Amino acid sequence: MGEKEDLFEASASVVGYIYQLRKALYACIERHGRGLDWCIAIEAGDDIEEITDRGRVLSQLKHRATGVSLTDSSTDLWKTLRIWAHAITHERVDLDGTDLLLLTTADLPAGSVGFLLQPVASGVRNEDRALEALVAAREASVSRENRKAYEAFDKLSEAERRSMVARIQVIGHAPDIDAMEALLLEKVVPAVGHQYAESFLERLEGWFYRRTIRQLRTDEMDAITGEEFDQVFTDLRDQFRPGNLPIDDDIALLEPDPSDHVDMVFVRQLGLINAGGAQLRIAVRDYIRAFTQRSRWSDENLLLPGEISRYERRLVEEWQDIFAEMEDNLGAEATEAEKVAAAKEVYRWATREARRCIRPDCDEPFVAKGSFHILADDLRLGWHIDFLARLMAVLEPAEATSA
């Protein structure tokens, strides 16, 4: 039973943390395009801390199951108050320039502290009644779980309590983690359209999570600034323009082990031209990156119908020009050394000079270089003048044996 409870608590913590990140990302997207003078941090001054030219907002987030209510004795309420009271007592927060926000997916019972501290626009806000209810709840409760929160509350003077309550806003029945994903998708649709919204958001969230981890592992304040977010958002959006395709960092950094691919045809092709170890490593790297990136584009429907086929046709036809020139220059009496030297020039052209982009603005080198290796693996092109005959002589007997 204990293990199940621990697993439930761990799962709830993970959900709560992802919820926190999604709310922070939503806040960034909301501010995007409305100026750069802001920054946001996770688990710095609070769950989420926002600093703008209008002041500071400290937010506590509580993700709870459907049907849960935020009562006056709720642990969620008092844990939040404990954090804020502690910050006030230790002079880590200036209430004159700070808003305190408690956002919860729980319901706010009528007349409760949370209900009475909703934003002014709700029409029910009453700070005096809310403070009275807090004091009454504190005096009536014997909760051990809330003991430290009560002690922190007791340390506040009457004036400090009133000042704190005046800065608190409670938002109940907030969108849960799934609803937040839907809201995020709505936010990015204007940037990339409905067709690419999910792919765009997946990449933006990935960057945001990695960036947040970096911030959490840094001792000093390393908040995400408006300028930084604007650059990332804009750069990523541009990758979804009609003339571009997204290049994913996790793929662009792949470094596969060449020894895992020694039997592949494109590697055998390099063996025919006596390619060195460094060239083999780079070739395998480019092949894997291009293959993986192209597969992801296809899986996410980011490609136009027949786009890969048309791209490969262009590469093959360009190669045909270079290869035909090599054949003419070598002639029938060429030695093996001359053939290898000429093949190296063809390979050099493919990897150093041919930069045919799949789309005008998608100029990542591994896409073209790796696509050449994909074609070489299918024997649709090669480097050595006799590549087809030599490889077929090796591959066909092997295929017959395996059959």
Regions found by a protein language model. Give the residues of each.
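Basic, amphipathic N-terminal segments that precede the first structured/catalytic domain
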Residues: 2-7, 11-29, 375, 402-403
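Acidic metal-coordinating catalytic centers involved in nucleic-acid phosphodiester chemistry
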Residues: 1-11, 63-358
